[in-house]
Amino acid sequence: MGNRKRLIFAVFTLFVILLSGSGSSYNYFPMDKSIPLVTFIFDDGNDTDYIVAKDIFDAHGDVACSAITTDWINTKNHLNVSQLTELQNNGWEILSHTVSHPNLKTLPESQVETELAQSKATLEGLGLTVKNLAYPYNKNNYTIREVAKKYYRAGRSGHNMLNPPTILDQYDLKAYSSNHPLSKLEGHVDKAYSEKKWLILYHHRIEVKIKISGKTGNFIPGENLTFNPSGATGKYISDKNFVAYGSAMHLVPISGTPQANDIITGQTSGAACNLDRVDYNQEKALIELIEYIHTKYPDMRIVTIDKGLDIYL
């Protein structure tokens, strides 16, 4: 009986060795797909991917994805080639987000093909590796997905759903907008972890919105701002007065955290105003969400789209 067991074991061992040398792609020891995942994607190629988000992910040992509309590369408030290259060299994934950011569902198939093929070719011509796509406005249909299959491994849409590993629709990957209170985003993380699914969150430009008063002069778009006494700095985007709300300012956070009662000064215009309150700070919320994931679910993985596909497919 002992000899028979040894013979069976020897035959099995030989079988495995032959398979491993045959080039067979079948995974006889499959990866555990019941791993909860989170992916962060920043759409449009805003410069805040580099000047804000990169430092946040670096500090936590994580990476994210930047979805690039190629017509906007090297334009105001968007990433330049050097920044894109550094992001990818740092482990970020660069996704295509088409050439001109159209609603693909409004285009004939020939134009869809142009948008998807040329954007990939342009990015690759810059020396970047591009395997996956984010649909502008999350819009896609059967025809668009069939075109995407010619050029990409996967495509991300919206739908406000999680992605199950067992029935992954790789050309219609589900995602949630990050434009919600932190508590709601934490709820998405909780659900993904408990159900062992893949949560994809998409973002745009990282901004701070504040209520201001006592404005003197006019701020210049893109100028640097200082906040005293907090010592924070930022980049001015816009401000507008609302009848019921009062005046609101949008800015890109650069350093520090703006505080109520700060005096804001434009470094080029000399304009100034009072900071009454911070309505939302997307930089702070992003940091807190990443720390929530690492603290509460240390075995939950933050991955790029391509890495998530490696795990789930």
Regions found by a protein language model. Give the residues of each.
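Secretory targeting signatures
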Residues: 1-28
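Boundary/entry segment of secreted carbohydrate-active catalytic domains
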Residues: 27-51
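C-terminal domain-boundary segment and adjacent tail
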Residues: 28-32, 64-68, 72-74, 124-125, ...
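Metal-dependent polysaccharide deacetylase catalytic core of the NodB/CE4 family, i.e.
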Residues: 35-38, 58-154, 158-173, 196-207
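Aromatic- and glycine-enriched glycan-recognition loops and surfaces
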Residues: 44-51, 75-86, 284
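Aromatic/hydrophobic pocket-lining residues that form the small-molecule binding cavity
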Residues: 50, 80, 112, 116, ...
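A short, Lys/Arg-enriched amphipathic alpha-helix followed by its capping loop at the start of a domain
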Residues: 52-62, 90, 289-296
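Autoprocessing Asn-cyclization modules and mimics
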Residues: 207-277
